[in-house]
Curated annotation (Swiss-Prot):
Pfam families: A_deaminase, A_deaminase_N
One of the GO BP terms on file: inosine biosynthetic process
Gene Ontology, cellular component aspect: extracellular space
Superkingdom, natural source: Eukaryota
Active site: E392, H414
Sequence similarity: Belongs to the metallo-dependent hydrolases superfamily. Adenosine and AMP deaminases family. ADGF subfamily.
Top-level EC class: hydrolase
Name of this protein: Adenosine deaminase 2
EC number: 3.5.4.4
Region forming the signal peptide: 1-26
Amino acid sequence: MFLKFKNIFFIVLTLSIVFNGLIVNSKNIHINNKNNNNNNNNKDLSSSESGSSSDINPYISQYNSERETLVNQENQIKLGSNTPFNSKEQQANTIFLNILQNEELSFSNNDPSGVNFFIEKQIIENESTIFKIIQNMPKGSALHVHQDSSATYDYLISVGSYLPNCYIYLTYDVNDANNGTFHFYDSQPTDSNWKLLSTIREGVSNVESFDQQLLDSLTLIGQDYGDYVSLWRKFDGIFGRVNGLVTYLPIATGYMEHLFQQMIQDGVQHIEVRKCFGDFYDLTGKIYDDYWFVQTMEELVLTTRQKYNMSEFALKIIGCNGRHNNQSVVYDAMVMSLDLRNKYPSTFVGYDLVGPEDEGYPLIYFIEQFAEIKKLGYQYQYPLDYYFHAGETILYNNTNLYDAILLNTKRIGHGIQLPKHPLLMDLVLKNDIGIEICPISNQILQYVSDMRAHPGLDLLNRGLPVTISPDDPAIFNYGGLSYDFFELTYSWGLNLQQLKQLAINSINHSNTFNQSEYNLLYNAWEVKWFNFIDYIINTYSNI
């Protein structure tokens, strides 16, 4: 990862990679033997020095040998240590690492790792060869992305907001939570703060600039973050403002098509979205529920496979509620999830609770509801699986990780606090629970300031099944997975063998309906991976 601030200074990140070998730099050791016997001042010291060297060198030799053994032993449990890697992949990896090191050396001795993603995004896009390579990398699955912020919002503004009858709520009260909210009405609402967007556009001198302001209002770009609580309120507020667009029937399917296109172009073959329960609407006021959405998505996946000639492409849906909801609401949602799971078993896969963990109810608060759902699940062919957000917090006393594991969660969303729980890490490894790391999200939402210190690196070095996801990329002003992979490549010193294993991890922890679907996904990814290796060798061998 690198950064250049407005041509003032350059930044370099020094990458230490000990994966394919160990380089030991030993300082010259000078031993000065002082002879206290005045009668021996003129004695030839060569034999004395030779004797000292023979005494010390065996120690150094043994030390270096033990050191190399220790480092190699630790490397054996790190990500990628057992990943198959042939000679051609090694050739591509050498090229990849040379490019990475050259990019680092082209910048000054300042460190970018603590800089916010918003500041460096344009530099990454314009100046990094490594980023271009990662864009071409087949990434497997994106396992943690929220449906209503899964693809960039430019589609909502450039297409959705130009549809007839689009209104925006505008008031001079900056504290009004509804300010900037979009919605479609068949006629002018009684509340005069709702303004017809087409009329507003007719009155502005620069429509392109106006639309850019609308788009910026749906991201965290340029906002005064304030403290952690204020940041989360601004973050949540965007979901409220955009809801009237993403749930409007003429836009809903198009937005998901936009997601599919962005992910496929970025090398993603399998997507799993968290979809909060809520209805869709049309201009007549007719309501379309989550059953409609799941069925519509199954149809859209079929057309997408044909459009892109990708028989392996898949979408899975995880139903969810905000963790601020009461027990009754959560129970009803889980009952619906159980029904959806059995009506659409190849698409609807489970349930989660979302939202800031430090402000909403902990998982233990809903233990009676979980117990009832477990009992109810015996009446169905498919029980309800869980994919809990847990450990997305900076507080020491958060208990959600304990309950997520005890409730047999299939994966853990974020898991930032997991390295503080050695026993839980052992259980995650033993039970093969996938961990969904969302690095850019974690930085922007102030869980991690310096990407090099991201706790995911500890999990990765322990050999836990880490996967990489974008979380809410639309609000963070990007699409796909390449930016997250890029951030970690620079900050964690990842090589191609490790990137390969991250992609494999994502496939292994995907919700494939059966072995046939898994084989289809993995085999298609593997073909793309070796094409990617050829691309690196053919394109960058002479650099």
